[in-house]
A protein has these predicted regions:
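Metal-associated gating/positioning segment near the N- to mid-region
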Residues: 57-58, 66-107
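Histidine-rich, glycine-flanked metal-binding segment
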Residues: 2-25, 29-73
Length: 107
């Protein structure tokens, strides 16, 4: 599928017109702009979050229960010295990603 087709799918899924690839129900969505934490359901299409307010009964290939866990954007560590960790970049990623850090600026 070309980029235009993917974009159209993302929009159509966000509008509830086509099924999600995955749906995560019952999460607490952290809005980092307002500071509010609100219940939500996350709809995913082509590996991208397209909505945090999907209906519970929305069609999806895969459905998970988030069991009230928190959903928030990934963190970016803007200052890390990989050499002082005594890990390879891949080893550091194996440790950091499960804890929410998705990117680093390293020297």
């Amino acid at each position: 599928m070309d980029l235009t087709g993917v974009r159209m799918d993302l929009v159509q899924a966000a509008l509830g017109r086509i099924a999600f690839d995955a749906l995560i129900l019952n999460v607490q969505v952290v809005n980092v702009y307002s500071g509010l934490v609100e219940p939500g359901n996350i709809g995913i299409k082509h590996g991208r979050i397209v909505t945090c307010q999907a209906p519970k009964d929305a069609p999806a290939e895969t459905v998970w229960d988030g069991q009230g866990r928190f959903a928030l954007p990934g963190l970016i560590d803007t200052h890390v010295h990989i050499d002082s960790t005594l890990l390879t970049p891949a080893g550091l990623a194996e440790f950091m990603v499960p804890h929410g850090t998705i990117a680093v600026f390293a020297d």
